[in-house]
Swiss-Prot record:
The keyword Nucleus applies. One of its GO terms (cellular component) is nucleolus. Pfam families: HEAT_MROH2B_C (PF23227). This is Protein maestro. The lineage of its organism: Eukaryota, Metazoa, Chordata, Craniata, Vertebrata. It comes from Mus musculus (Mouse). It comes from the Eukaryota. Its main location: nucleus. InterPro entries: ARM-like (IPR011989), ARM-type_fold (IPR016024), HEAT_Maestro (IPR055406), Maestro_heat-like_prot (IPR045206). It is found in: Nucleus, Nucleolus. Coiled coil: none annotated. Prominent expression seen in testis, brain, liver and heart. Weakly expressed in the kidney. HEAT repeats lie at residues 128-163. Keywords: Nucleus. Residues 1-23 are annotated as: Disordered.
């Protein structure tokens, strides 16, 4: 039976001007819907932040932990512009969680979320929060939990990048008081922590204080100075060892 016939190949019909006119109102409608959704998202973010702020102050540690996780999700998913807009509120809640008197889970979640926050705001506008975060991050470098130590080293490395001129003197003191921890964890039993520590040491090299040298340097002292500069670029962990043991 020859009922099936081959249909010759024909070019697809091009859209007429009439179909284009129909499409224009559709695009306009979609853009309006998109704009309304963006407004709703902004309002949703504000409302979500209000709820999380209440949960972060709850007497129940589990609820506080969930609040920190929620802040982490907001910091990760919200547009950078919105995160910067509400950074003071978020930082206040996260620092509160960072110093939680009871729950190590709340503290760890706060550290993880702070690493996201600092990445989003690039360290701008931290204000006095910088001191609070640095002091607690230092204590967590020696935590028993591998995951907490890892997150603390990542956070401390970020702080080294964002210290700037305002906090340079303060952070230099903190780094030099942390030399033993930095040196010890280069050989951490957790490879992940050891790697994070190495990256943090590299970020902290500009804040390491060598011993003071007199204005007149002997040939040996000049060689030591050159060696310090070379090690700071190539092997900062060795330089840290030399400084900690007063070899250089």
């Amino acid at each position: 039976m020859e009922q099936t016939r081959k249909i010759p190949n024909q070019p697809l019909p091009t859209p007429t001007s009439q179909s284009k006119k129909r499409r224009t109102p559709l695009l306009s409608f979609l853009s309006k819907v998109s704009w309304k959704l963006r407004l709703q998202k902004r309002e949703l973010l504000k409302n979500a932040l209000f709820v999380l702020a209440e949960r972060a102050r709850d007497p129940n540690a589990k609820k506080r932990h969930l609040a920190m996780r929620g802040l982490g999700a907001l910091a990760r998913e919200a547009p950078d512009k919105q995160v910067r807009k509400y950074k003071k509120v978020m930082l206040d809640l996260l620092v509160r969680g960072l110093y939680d008197p009871v729950s190590s889970e709340v503290i760890h979640e706060s550290v993880k979320t702070l690493t996201i926050m600092l990445g989003k705001i690039q360290g701008h506008g931290l204000g006095s929060f910088f001191i609070d975060i640095t002091l607690q991050a230092r204590t967590l470098l020696d935590d028993e939990d591998d995951s907490v130590r890892y997150s603390a080293f990542v956070l401390f490395g970020q702080l080294a990048s964002f210290a700037g001129w305002r906090w340079k003197k303060f952070f230099t003191q903190q780094v030099n008081q942390t030399q033993d921890s930095l040196l010890g964890h280069l050989q951490d039993e957790s490879p992940k922590v050891a790697k994070a520590c190495k990256m943090t040491v590299r970020a902290c090299v500009p804040y390491l204080k060598p011993r003071k040298v007199p204005s007149f340097q002997s040939e040996e002292e000049q060689k030591n100075h050159r060696l310090s500069r070379q090690l700071s670029h190539c092997h900062p962990e060795i330089l840290l060892f030399f400084y900690a043991n007063k070899i250089l």
